[in-house]
């Protein structure tokens, strides 16, 4: 999971992004709200290439103050339910930092399988790296 704080965009950029997502057959956005504010969201995108239209990748972000409340689990279940009903989507994919053990455990609990790894893909500081683990789940 990525921190919501890392997703820096202007209000206008957010509005344009949400408009695009709500009018797309290849993209989905599900938002978790708590006490009138966005607590997190999950976004799915499927490529417009015909040979890859059966696949898609998602990213999930939960704000720090709303973690450990089951929102990630709820958002992931919502996305997978949507993907299972989608007429084209057969495979849902993600990338997760190897240091994010809690997220990896959640994805495995939902049936995601590791299919690859980008070694030292993410650099946190001087000589501090993490792999980017690629995972997928078949939904058909």
Feature names for model-found ranges:
Residues 62, 68-83, 104-109:
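Conserved acetyl-CoA-binding loop-helix of GNAT-fold acetyltransferases
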Residues 90, 97-104, 110, 117-140:
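C-terminal "cap" of GNAT-fold acetyltransferases
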Residues 6-65, 76-77, 138-140:
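Acetyl-CoA-dependent GNAT
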Residues 21-22, 37, 44, 72, ...:
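Localized chelating/binding microdomains
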Residues 1-5:
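Short, surface-exposed loop/turn segments at secondary-structure junctions
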């Amino acid at each position: 999971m990525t921190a919501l704080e890392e997703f820096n965009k202007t209000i206008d950029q957010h509005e344009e992004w949400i408009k695009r997502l709500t009018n797309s057959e290849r993209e989905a956005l599900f938002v978790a709200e708590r006490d009138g504010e966005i607590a997190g969201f999950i976004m799915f995108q499927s490529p417009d290439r015909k040979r890859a239209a059966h696949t898609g990748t998602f990213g999930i972000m939960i704000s720090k103050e709303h973690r450990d409340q089951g929102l990630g689990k709820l958002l992931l279940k919502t996305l997978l339910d949507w993907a299972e009903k989608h007429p084209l989507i057969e495979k849902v994919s993600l990338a997760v930092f190897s240091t994010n053990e809690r997220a990896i455990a959640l994805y495995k609990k939902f049936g995601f399988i590791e299919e690859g790894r980008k070694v030292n893909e993410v650099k946190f500081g001087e000589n501090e790296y993490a792999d980017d683990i690629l995972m997928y789940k078949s939904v058909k």
